[in-house]
Amino acid sequence: MAELTIPADLKPRDGRFGSGPSKVRPEQLQALAAAGDLFGTSHRQAPVKNLVGRVRDGIKQLFSVPEGYDVILGNGGSTAFWDAAAFGLIDKRSLHLTYGEFSAKFASAVAKNPFVGDPIVVKADPGSAPEPQSDPSVDVIAWAHNETSTGVAVPVQRPADSGDALIVIDATSGAGGLPVDIAQADAYYFAPQKNFAGDGGLWLAVVSPAALARIEAIGQSGRWVPDFLSLPIAVENSLKNQTYNTPAIGTLVLLADQLDWLNGNGGLDWAVKRTADSSQRLYSWAEASSYATPFVTDPALRSQVVGTIDFADDVDAAAVAKVLRANGIVDTEPYRKLGRNQLRVAMFAAVDPEDVSALTRCVDWVVERL
């Protein structure tokens, strides 16, 4: 099967459809080469601090960050931020919506933390999602804007009667590709390797005045927190355009260039229209197909940035992905733990909608010949 050769005129111009790490634009790599003078220099000095400032300013512009909100960052990616939030944003107890691997992982991290109460977990099966909701016993309400493992997107909207509870949104794969009103969240956190077309290892968060006050209060409470996961330390350094420990300069350069590209093309509105175009092409193809169907049955929950497409039992999705990979069309395999006969397609802002259409034509071509 792997010897099938897809005609060149059918193939996408860029065959990268991974859900993270994701496609990096060639211009970003040129920016990386042009930034050579920054490599091997101190992250406490002006050149690198200016780069961090450029990233923070770019995020503020992209998300039209309200007055009083700020952008903080640290090393370790969203995985590290789960623990940082458990230590530094939850006062007593949290509520988590879980509907896939990554939304469940934050809840699991909180459950293991000895300084906070057992979380309330509202669970839905993969492919669906619970309605955002509140509980009077919690001071943090958390869910994922986009569940990367399943292709389910849940809008960011404060639940009724949420009171003073902080709304903490995992936007790892949603930020920069899905619509959002940042004022509806208190901590909107993400990483660069999805819509921002960069490398991993960094977390960033847009935080509200209420979140900043909570961070300060917990920081002064005497709760033990490892310095690496300390949000007060992250805030202190971020306001100086620094990270607590040495960042990867290349990651920051790629991120800064992608932010410039997004903002230069029209900002979040432009990016959302682009991902909507890509996803409409993918889902329309699947709905018209004789062998493929969108895994997420409710169109309102279907993600614009990560599409999961189930195949009929008589079509081996793994075999299709293998042929695609052999032809330079890569990372369409499903999330490993989901265990479904499907393809998963990233449609982040850097992905050309025309390439999504080309991908669907290639899948049809391969399936006809298997």
Swiss-Prot record:
Q: Which cofactor does it need?
A: pyridoxal 5'-phosphate
| Family in the record | Belongs to the class-V pyridoxal-phosphate-dependent aminotransferase family. SerC subfamily.
Membrane found in the keyword field: no
What does UniProt list as this organism's lineage? Bacteria, Bacillati, Actinomycetota, Actinomycetes, Mycobacteriales
UniProt-annotated binding residues for L-glutamate: 44
List residues, modification N6-(pyridoxal phosphate)lysine: 194
Keyword tags: Amino-acid biosynthesis, Aminotransferase, Cytoplasm, Pyridoxal phosphate, Pyridoxine biosynthesis, Serine biosynthesis, Transferase
> Subunit comment for this entry?
Homodimer.
Pathway assignment = Amino-acid biosynthesis; L-serine biosynthesis; L-serine from 3-phospho-D-glycerate: step 2/3; Cofactor biosynthesis; pyridoxine 5'-phosphate biosynthesis; pyridoxine 5'-phosphate from D-erythrose 4-phosphate: step 3/5
Q: Name one GO cellular component term.
A: cytoplasm
- Give the reaction(s) catalysed: O-phospho-L-serine + 2-oxoglutarate = 3-phosphooxypyruvate + L-glutamate; 4-(phosphooxy)-L-threonine + 2-oxoglutarate = (R)-3-hydroxy-2-oxo-4-phosphooxybutanoate + L-glutamate
Enzyme class, first EC level, given as a word: transferase
Give the protein's function.
Answer: Catalyzes the reversible conversion of 3-phosphohydroxypyruvate to phosphoserine and of 3-hydroxy-2-oxo-4-phosphonooxybutanoate to phosphohydroxythreonine.
Per the annotation, how and in what number is the cofactor bound?
Answer: Binds 1 pyridoxal phosphate per subunit.
Q: Name the HAMAP family for this protein.
A: SerC_aminotrans_5 (MF_00160)
Q: Which domain of life is it from?
A: Bacteria
User: Which residues does the annotation say bind pyridoxal 5'-phosphate?
Assistant: 102, 148, 170, 193, 245-246
**What's the protein name?**
Putative phosphoserine aminotransferase
